[in-house]
Amino acid sequence: MEITDVRLRRVETDGRMKAISSITIDGEFVIHDIRVIDGNEGLFVAMPSKRTPDGEFRDIAHPINSGTRAKIQEAVLAAYEVADEPAVNEESSADESVVEEN
């Protein structure tokens, strides 16, 4: 599995979310709404999730092994570090910056 494209949009919120990302896997499959979160021990990647009726959050898509999770996190955080556009307000419709990985 190779991450062939990362699109990232920085957001400015009062919370800990710093960016929203989409990744393309092998040029054939896209996962949207991957979030970059500023956690207690630094930045980390949160997979897309949905709130259940009982208030619990469940991942919609997620890697099933630690190696794949590491690949996704490394690719998204690398795109976050090189994104040179300024943060935008979450409500605005800014274009996404694109970082391609091969």
UniProtKB/Swiss-Prot annotation:
Cystine crosslinks: none
Leader peptide range in chain numbering: none
Functional summary from the UniProt entry: Could be involved in septation.
Organism: Listeria innocua serovar 6a (strain ATCC BAA-680 / CLIP 11262)
Family: Belongs to the SpoVG family.
Keyword set, alphabetical order: Cell cycle, Cell division, Septation
Protein name in the entry: Putative septation protein SpoVG 1
Classification via SUPFAM superfamilies: SpoVG-like
PANTHER family per UniProt: SEPTATION PROTEIN SPOVG-RELATED (PTHR38429:SF1)
GO biological process, one term: sporulation resulting in formation of a cellular spore
